Curated annotation (Swiss-Prot):
Keyword Glycoprotein: no
Composition bias, Basic and acidic residues: 416-427
Keyword annotations: Plasmid, Plasmid partition
Name of the protein this chain belongs to: Protein rep
Family recorded in the similarity comment: Belongs to the Gram-positive plasmids replication protein type 1 family.
GO BP: any one term: plasmid partitioning
Role played: Essential for the autonomous replication of the plasmid pIJ101.
Gene designation per UniProt: rep
Residue spans of biased composition, Acidic residues class: 428-437
Length: 456
């Protein structure tokens, strides 16, 4: 929050309300407020990608990956097994089972000596027309079975591409054969199981539960996906899931991370264990939340494979900076601001201490057709009066509201320019890293040959 100006609670042309002047943490794993907006925007991106792909004639699958787990397993160990370890100054990053899915000669094929892939050496990815995938990681925890991290991925197949890396483009679509799809699904199940077994035999899932495939047949399926991931899971939505892990209520005695946080808040606020939502003692919930914080640090909750966005003609990225961009863009989604009030820093702190911030933003909405600035100001002032802060509200003139909207758009435009430049740098860095990796692999191969037995 800007101490000099406090916040602005404004009504948009669409009748919604926004709060300008607040700092955003952008922590998708840990902040319920930021996560709700980020995941909603991510869900819109995912839906746009799936709809675009199906319109082009491609095919999409929802694939869910799980590992066997028990109450003594650490979340960090399970996340390492699924997603890979995080790079540290002392150790390189180690791939997880997810990364193993799209590596190796069986998957990628073998290149002929002239650098072109020969027809008899194509890999599974060529036969199914693999284009890329979007991965989302979800976590639940229970007192009996412990942590349960799992991955949902939208996999796009049935495409033919040309070019490499940043120049890669989709040039055609086709329907993969049933034999090719069966081969792919069997290969992924085998690779997933073997990769987890290698990390820890206890994580090895059975063939029935480790990897599950669901085909998205039509654009309606994609829209159903959007409907599901944009609202609370209530048992009536389609069995399709990806981005909105923040809204999910776990079942079978398990709880989602934000349910841990909610129970912590209820118990520290004086509610009894019987009355508070969720399970377990305060100590158990605090311990699980702290473990969750440590295990998710530095990881991406939602990630697209490299160059997939550009091949589909979509912008955006997967970093924390991109998440912050989405938060800022969400403020501008409602259109031009038409009414608003300024609230001082002390006034807004009084509102949040009484948990009235949601009521204050609702008071600024104009869905009932009430767009009069004075009326908006009066409704917000009535809410702040409950926190003894009515005198901290100042109704803004039309010119002041327009100036606030212009500042918001200017900040958004600047962030988008910075994001474009940042992604270009990241793309260049990725290509440099690829070249370094190839050199390291070649050096290791030469070293192995040099250290091998000498024939006489």
């Amino acid at each position: 929050m800007d101490p000099a100006s406090g916040v602005i609670v404004a009504q948009t042309a669409a009748g919604t309300s926004v709060v300008l002047g607040l700092m955003r943490c952008g922590r998708i794993w840990l902040c319920p407020v930021c996560a709700a907006t980020i995941r909603h925007k991510r869900a819109e991106e995912i839906t746009a990608a799936v709809v675009e792909w199906i319109k082009r004639g491609g095919t999409a699958y929802l694939v869910t990956f799980t590992a066997r787990h028990g109450h003594t397993d650490r979340l960090a160990d399970l996340m390492d097994a699924l997603q890979g370890t995080r790079k540290t100054p002392d150790s390189p990053r180690r791939p997880g089972a997810y990364q193993r899915l799209i590596t190796g000669g069986t998957w990628a094929g073998r290149r002929a000596k002239d650098g072109h892939r020969a027809a008899d050496r194509e890999g599974i990815r060529d036969r199914i027309g693999y284009v890329g995938m979007i991965r989302a990681t979800e976590v639940t925890v229970g007192q009996i079975n412990g942590w349960h991290p799992h991955i949902h991925a939208i996999v796009l197949v049935g495409g033919r591409t040309e070019g490499e890396r940043s120049a890669k483009q989709i040039v055609a679509t086709f329907e993969p054969t049933g034999a090719a799809l069966d081969e792919w699904q069997g290969h992924w199940r085998s690779v997933w199981t073997a990769a987890l077994r290698k990390v820890n035999p206890a994580f090895t899932p059975d063939d029935r539960h480790g990897v599950d495939f669901k085909r998205l047949e039509t654009e309606r399926d994609a829209n159903d996906l959007a409907e599901y991931i944009a609202k609370t899971q209530d048992g009536k939505a389609p069995a399709l899931e990806l981005a909105r892990a923040d809204l999910k209520t776990a079942t079978g005695g398990n709880v989602a991370p934000f349910e841990l946080l909610g129970r912590i808040g209820d118990l520290t606020g004086g509610m009894t264990e019987d009355d508070a939502a969720g399970v377990g003692s305060l100590e158990w919930n605090l311990s699980r939340w702290h473990e969750y914080e440590r295990a998710t640090r530095g990881r991406r909750a939602i990630e697209w494979t490299r160059y997939l966005r550009q091949m589909l003609g979509l912008d955006g990225g997967d970093t924390e900076a991109d998440d912050l961009d989405l938060l800022l863009a969400a403020d501008a989604d409602g259109g031009e601001l038409r009414a608003g009030v300024a609230v001082t820093e002390d006034g807004w702190h009084a509102v949040t201490r009484r948990a009235l911030d949601l009521e204050a933003t609702r008071a600024a909405e104009g869905k009932d057709g009430n767009e009069d600035p004075a009326a908006v100001g009066e409704r917000v002032r009535e809410v702040l009066a409950l926190a003894d802060a009515a005198d901290t509200v100042v109704v803004l003139t039309a010119g002041e509201v327009a100036e606030a909207y212009a500042d918001m758009l200017a900040a958004l435009a600047q962030r988008r320019e910075e994001a474009t430049a940042r992604r270009r740098r990241e793309q260049d860095d990725d290509q440099d890293d690829d070249a370094d990796d190839r050199q390291e692999r070649a050096a290791r191969h030469i070293a192995r040959l040099a250290s091998g037995p000498t024939s006489h």
